[in-house]
């Protein structure tokens, strides 16, 4: 889409009462935020998806018309369409829209239109985008700056994926999975890290992935700012090519915003931030893990850059409630083991689906609860990711005490030989790990769990597919209510 197209679209969507915007894949994490903002702005919003969810019900209550199927009938009175990156070009609604010459926008193109004439802040990176965006949103809201926010996960403090604000600030998560973040033109870009993921979209070239991040960063004008994690080698490789202002953060002693003396106690992270002027900030973070300290450091670097009061920022981080499905403590699950015995297990839900994310979650649990029996229920996400990172998955998954592995959530990808859960199961067993079970039927989960409980257990629900829905249905509904 070129500048003329954007001007044209901006022109006709300004007539809010007469135009209908249709979102295909409206239930996706990246799409719900856009739908919420459009509804708040007064547009007519419709959408389609295959599964109902609490967020879809919320959108309906706000006035959206949502169809739980894909059909060309859904776009009968539509003026233009926004499509999720997960939607195929062969989708019935996409094909019908092309026949009728209805404009079709990608998610990122719509965000760019919404962000026009605002001070755009984009949070990008392989890991940590959603949590970092949530922290930034909380800091700006608590500081009275009233930003507009679009996030890829539910921000607990506002119980939403998005918020329409009255100020000039527009904060958004920027998706690198299909390089669509290149449509954005923010004033400030945060890059949390660059690792091999979604590599099939980059011709299986990590070099091309890094180059795409560099292209994104080069979109910052001389008056803009890049805030980047100096601990990440791939980021350091591309920094010399930037001409804008650069602020670095990390554990590295050369960071502009440096993390120092990190400690962890249960769900609390404690560390100091050392600034270039040697000023020291005492940070207490309401979520554990060094990776979350890095996420907080990115938010701190931005807050300082924007002149936010340090005390307000520190208080906001201390009160940070977290993000849905990001190391989310659900409570204690009481499971009947028979013979009047019950096991009370800590239940943690986590969206991580990349070996690095899994490894960080495991490390975090081992630091705070070293003697707990760690049981992971894992659902691999995408055959391409499993194939490209197969060895890393085998090594990382072998680090837990008990592993229940579900079949791969394909996300509409075709099966790849050797990148399935049975292959993972067999190769983990070859390492001499006898605690791994392949879950071929979801009804096996509870019985398998009962056999592995030791009385000091942590159950970790891990993955990005529909594992949270499965686990909640199988575990929570068939056991005693979770007690926090």
Curated annotation (Swiss-Prot):
Reactions catalysed according to its record: UDP-N-acetyl-alpha-D-muramate + L-alanine + ATP = UDP-N-acetyl-alpha-D-muramoyl-L-alanine + ADP + phosphate + H(+)
Name the positions where ATP binds: 125-131
A GO molecular function annotation here is: ATP binding
Pathway given in the UniProt record: Cell wall biogenesis; peptidoglycan biosynthesis
Pfam families per the record? Mur_ligase, Mur_ligase_C, Mur_ligase_M
The family database entries (InterPro entries) matched by this protein are listed as: Mur-like_cat_sf, Mur_ligase_C, Mur_ligase_C_dom_sf, Mur_ligase_cen, Mur_ligase_N, MurCDEF_pg_biosynth, UDP-N-AcMur_Ala_ligase_MurC
Out of the domains of life, which is the source? Bacteria
The answer to whether keyword Membrane applies is no
Q: Could you tell me the Gene Ontology terms of the biological process aspect for this record?
A: cell division; cell wall organization; peptidoglycan biosynthetic process; regulation of cell shape
Question: According to the UniProt record, what class of enzyme is this?
Answer: ligase
Enzyme nomenclature, EC number: 6.3.2.8
* Compartmental location: Cytoplasm
Q: Which UniProt keywords apply?
A: ATP-binding, Cell cycle, Cell division, Cell shape, Cell wall biogenesis/degradation, Cytoplasm, Ligase, Nucleotide-binding, Peptidoglycan synthesis
Q: Which family does it belong to?
A: Belongs to the MurCDEF family.
* General function of this protein: Cell wall formation.
Q: What is this protein called?
A: UDP-N-acetylmuramate--L-alanine ligase
Could you tell me which species this protein originates from? Buchnera aphidicola subsp. Acyrthosiphon pisum (strain Tuc7)
């Amino acid at each position: 889409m070129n500048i003329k197209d954007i001007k044209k679209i901006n022109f006709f969507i300004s007539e809010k009462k007469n135009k209908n915007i249709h979102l295909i894949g409206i239930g996706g994490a990246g799409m719900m935020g856009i739908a919420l903002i459009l509804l708040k702005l007064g547009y007519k919003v419709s959408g389609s998806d295959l599964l109902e969810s609490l967020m879809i019900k919320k959108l309906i209550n706000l006035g959206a018309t949502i169809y739980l199927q894909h059909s060309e009938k859904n776009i009968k009175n539509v003026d233009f369409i926004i499509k999720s990156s997960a939607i195929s070009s062969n989708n019935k609604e996409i094909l019908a829209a092309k026949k009728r010459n209805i404009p079709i926008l990608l998610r990122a193109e719509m965000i760019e239109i919404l962000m026009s004439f605002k001070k755009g802040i984009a949070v990008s990176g392989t890991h940590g985008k959603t949590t970092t965006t949530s922290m930034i949103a909380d800091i700006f809201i608590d500081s009275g700056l009233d930003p507009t926010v679009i996030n890829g996960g539910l921000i607990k403090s506002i119980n939403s994926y998005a918020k329409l604000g009255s100020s000039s600030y527009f904060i958004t998560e920027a998706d690198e999975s299909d390089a669509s973040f290149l449509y954005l033109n923010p004033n400030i870009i945060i890059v949390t890290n660059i690792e091999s993921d979604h590599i099939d979209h980059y011709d299986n070239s990590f070099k091309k992935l890094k180059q795409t991040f560099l292209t994104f960063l080069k979109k910052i004008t001389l008056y803009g700012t890049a805030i980047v994690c100096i601990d990440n080698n791939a980021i350091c490789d591309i920094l010399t090519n930037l001409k804008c202002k650069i602020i670095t953060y990390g554990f590295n002693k050369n960071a502009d915003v440096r993390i120092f003396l990190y400690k962890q106690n249960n769900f609390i992270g404690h560390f100091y931030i050392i600034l270039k002027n040697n000023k020291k900030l005492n940070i207490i973070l309401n979520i554990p893990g060094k990776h979350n300290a890095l996420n907080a450091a990115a938010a701190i670097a931005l807050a300082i850059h924007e002149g936010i009061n340090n005390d307000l920022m520190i208080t906001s981080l201390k009160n940070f409630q977290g993000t849905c499905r990001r190391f989310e403590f659900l409570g204690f699950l009481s499971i009947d083991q028979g013979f009047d015995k019950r096991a009370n297990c800590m239940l943690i839900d986590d969206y991580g689906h990349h070996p690095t994310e899994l490894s960080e979650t495991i490390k975090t649990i081992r630091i705070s609860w070293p003697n707990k029996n760690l049981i992971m229920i894992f659902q691999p996400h995408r055959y391409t990711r499993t194939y490209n990172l197969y060895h890393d998955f085998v090594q990382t998954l072998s680090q837990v005490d008990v592993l229940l592995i579900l079949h791969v959530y394909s996300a509409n990808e075709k099966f790849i030989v050797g990148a399935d859960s049975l292959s993972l199961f067999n190769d983990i067993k070859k390492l001499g790990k006898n605690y791994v079970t392949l879950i071929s039927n979801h009804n096996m989960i509870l019985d398998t769990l009962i056999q592995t409980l030791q009385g000091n257990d942590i159950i970790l629900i891990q993955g990005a597919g529909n594992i949270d829905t499965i686990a909640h249905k199988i575990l929570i509904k068939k056991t005693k209510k979770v007690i926090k």
